[in-house]
Amino acid sequence: MNISTTRRNFLKTTGATLSLAAVAPQIFAADNQSAPPPGKRAIQKAIMWATVGFKGSVADKMKAIRGAGFDGVEMMSHMNHEEVLKARDEVGLEIPSVCGEKHWAKPLSSPDENVRAEGLAGLQQTLRDAKAYGAGSILLVPGTVGNGVSYEECWTRSITEIRKAIPLAEELGVKISIENVWNNFITKEDEAARYLDEINSPWVGWHFDCGNIIRYGDPIAWIRKLSPRINRYHIKEFSLDRAMRTGSPGKGFDVPLLEGANNWRGIIQAIAATGYHGWAITEQGGGDTAEGLNDLALRLEKILILK
């Protein structure tokens, strides 16, 4: 099956519908539009829990994260609430987002309805975890194209399952944020906007990853297109040069922040122009030691203060 051709034909059909975001953008407003509380900067620094690689308890890792200068941490779903909350409160970190643990293994795009049901249950548990931690957003990979799943099937199946979770998201006050990843799905900003348009809920927005998109397009164009529906940002580097030299696209991520292809000054200016107040969450290698965490926090700070 030619996935690219299938996608073009499918998007030609969906593109003929009216863009709801253009008609009523206010209904899609993200949870980032109000002014930050007194004493807090507009964009705060956080790190993805899964990138903190050294051994230790939840409390040990949170202390190291806080000691490095991070304000928050994006937890994984399906963790022990009591342990996480105790460590959070002792250390003084915030939890702005929770990343779903099940969405790759149990994709909402699966042709197997039992797998989709497990994926939906995982999504719903992630929402409950976020509520318990005081997080306003969760990260969701909506599905994958390939292995017998077409672009259209991924689109329709994932939207069907996400809609089933919206009532719980609304009840809990937690937003579902779709992340752009390397899943052969939604590689253009116009596609992302149409996807959110079709879901048509203020409880579903975007979790934009600046590094993942470099392989396909311009992060700044994505930011401008999807604002104000971006709830959270992943700050991650990618080197096109390294990816091409090694012949392995994944090797492009093996580069420190500020040393890849991202135009960070332009990205920060684009984010500021949208009026975003919220979280920049680093999903970057290097967090295997306290020294590595310190370096990540310093590099993230250098990015955020660019004018």
Please identify what each model-predicted range represents:
Residues T14-A22, S109-G205, R215, R265:
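Active-site acidic/histidine proton-transfer and metal-coordination neighborhood
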Residues V52-S57, G72-V84, P107-L108, G146-S150, ...:
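Acidic-and-aromatic substrate-binding clefts and catalytic sites of carbohydrate-active enzymes
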Residues W279-Q284:
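Short acidic/histidine-rich active-site segments
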Residues N2-A132, E170, S201, G205, ...:
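N-terminal pre-domain/capping segments
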Residues I271:
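C-terminal "capping" alpha-helix adjacent to the active site of nucleotide-linked donor transferases
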Residues F70, A135, I230, Y276-H277:
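A structural motif
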Residues R66, V98, R163-A261, R265-I268:
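Acidic/histidine-rich catalytic cores of soluble enzymes
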